[in-house]
Amino acid sequence: MTEPIQPQAAVAADENQIVAERRDKLRALRDQGIAYPNDFQPTHHAADLQTAYADADKEALEAKSLEVAIAGRMMLKRVMGKASFATVQDGSGQIQFFVTPADVGAETYDAFKKWDLGDIVAARGVLFRTNKGELSVKCTQLRLLAKALRPLPDKFHGLADQETRYRQRYVDLIVTPETRTTFRARTKAIASIRKFMGDADFMEVETPMLHPIPGGAAAKPFVTHHNALDMEMFLRIAPELYLKRLIVGGFERVFEINRNFRNEGVSPRHNPEFTMMEFYAAYTDYRWLMDFTERLIRQAAVDALGTATIQYQGRELDLAQPFHRLTITQAIQKYAPSYTDGQLSDDAFLRSELKRLGVDVTQPAFLNAGIGALQLALFEETAEAQLWEPTFIIDYPIEVSPLARESDTVAGITERFELFITGREIANGFSELNDPEDQAARFKKQVEQKDAGDEEAMFFDADYIRALEYGMPPTGGCGIGIDRLVMLLTDSPTIRDVLLFPHLRRED
């Protein structure tokens, strides 16, 4: 007995039938020698016309008699006897085509009636306004430029499955206006950052993506092999040490926007491949960096969105207001006021409290952790997620800041900050350690931690020490997570929403 077809199988069967029918249509086009023409050049874009002639009435458009040539994807078609309409979407927006056999010819009109949604079409004609007030192109020429073999998703439901949206981003971009808006905002934000940096006399540079020694961050690297050199290499986890070599070389202000790779987990805030901007400026410190970073983020919001007041997950956020500044212990006591100064300086209490909060204090990173590292862990458990408004957390312990300059006034503390907005880290910066002997000692400490089982501890980079031995001026450096910044600006709850092609498991 034949089992009934399940709904999902039925949908697949229907789609296969549609694809088969469209392949037949493509075969007919091939037979005619007109399957994929490549000689059409648009003269206008839909959104430009919609903007330029938004207030033009029917009579004004008739008097102007503007001839246009537009191409795009057919998203909607209504065949109504001797007159038909098609909504066409190009890279800028949508506009309506008005098609009649009298204007395009009976043969073209008959062909048009057989075209499918998703087809790439082109038209020449005159801009006019219909009796219902719709800005349209009265087509005098109409062509099919590319046949769509697969049907678009249902216009009312779109791509309902989130993973399908990520996996088939090309379809998501076609049918989801919000997705297109997100990635346009991303491009505007990055362009704004580049201009901001250029206006501040920073030079954009490119440093290696393959490193002989992973460095510049505490992270687990991806490992590969360089066949020509017969050596193990690592996809970079951060460009920091190369950028600071450039400071040594005399380029006093440098920045790079590029990819980093960390062979770690995937979460709403993490993707193993992500975009960072790092910048370094000689003769600055972490206070200068905080002021500069605040202005940069504010300007990126204005350039991408037109305002510094944004909405994120139902709450308003005003980036025009001064960003807060708190130490780690100040933040803990602000959001968990029951902790006393004495408790926050008690090793046994901190370990017990972290264990109560579910932190595994037996892992290698905690075995020899000092008070500062334990305070940071408690901050991450009690305060970090509460930092909704832009807040610089400052004065990080030296034991978790191996590349940062130690404070001149407080032992064991570095001139370092991390910027949090909506409970997420957006930026990390500090006055750079430029003492080669101190840096070498800290690298050795990191190697000891790695030998003890801490996979994220840093390697000893002898060439970087050699560079510092030539002398590096006092320098401030900062890294900004571009993906997380775009999440903030576009009201996106997960990092996958702002990556065109996020990492996914293989399809079965």
From Swiss-Prot:
Oligomer status and interactors: Homodimer.
Main location: cytoplasm
Top-level class of the enzyme under EC nomenclature: ligase
EC number: 6.1.1.6
NCBIfam families in alphabetical order: lysS_bact, PRK00484.1
Gene3D superfamilies: Bira Bifunctional Protein, Domain 2, Nucleic acid-binding proteins
Disulfide-bonded cysteines: none
Catalytic activity of the protein: tRNA(Lys) + L-lysine + ATP = L-lysyl-tRNA(Lys) + AMP + diphosphate
Sites where the protein binds Mg(2+) 1: E418, E425
Similarity section: Belongs to the class-II aminoacyl-tRNA synthetase family.
Name of this protein: Lysine--tRNA ligase
GO cellular component: cytosol
PANTHER family with a match to the protein in the record: LYSINE--TRNA LIGASE, CHLOROPLASTIC_MITOCHONDRIAL, LYSYL-TRNA SYNTHETASE
Entry annotated with the keyword Metal-binding: yes
Lineage: Bacteria, Pseudomonadati, Pseudomonadota, Betaproteobacteria, Burkholderiales
Cofactor: Mg(2+)
Localization annotation: Cytoplasm
